[in-house]
Regions:
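Conserved active-site alpha-helix within GNAT-family acetyltransferase domains
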Residues: 48-52, 56-83
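Conserved acetyl-CoA-binding loop-helix of GNAT-fold acetyltransferases
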Residues: 20, 25, 30-44
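Short acidic (Asp/Glu) patches
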Residues: 3, 36-42, 71-78
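Short coil/turn motifs at secondary-structure junctions
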Residues: 4-6, 28, 59
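Generic beta-strand structural signal
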Residues: 21, 50-52, 87-89
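C-terminal "cap" of GNAT-fold acetyltransferases
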Residues: 76-117
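A conserved beta-strand-loop-helix scaffold within acyl/acetyltransferase catalytic domains
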Residues: 1-23
Length: 117
């Protein structure tokens, strides 16, 4: 349900991030609170991370649970440098170990196969 990714706001230290992937509910079960219950449970399960992150298909679900959009530009770190990803968007969840963050700063994540965000 989540993978460890290392997000880095600007030139600040890397943040150990629980990056959530593949949240979906079968259409016939939507609207019954299943995804909300799973995401609430997930928030308690990832409390030892510095940050929660995801790329939302349905932002309203996450917004009502405290997730907020990163407002600054997004980049992917590669061995050759940073790649701008202006088409990407991410939301973050502040956790007990989350440092003070300026969400307008650029943020980068390490390269991964498949979808970058």
């Amino acid at each position: 349900m989540w993978v460890t990714r290392w997000l880095q706001p600007s030139n600040q230290p890397l943040l150990r991030t629980a990056y959530v992937e593949m949240v979906a509910t079968e259409p016939e079960f939507q609207g019954r609170g299943f995804a909300t219950a799973v995401m609430r449970r997930l928030a308690s399960a990832i409390h030892d991370f510095q940050l929660g992150g995801l790329s939302p298909a349905e932002p309203m679900l996450y917004t009502k649970l405290g997730w907020v959009f990163w407002q600054g530009p997004l980049f992917i770190r590669t061995k050759d440098g940073l790649i701008s990803t202006p088409e990407g968007s991410i939301m973050i969840l502040r956790l007990p170990k989350t440092p003070c963050l300026d969400l307008t700063l650029p943020v980068s994540a390490g390269w991964c196969e498949g979808e970058l965000w």
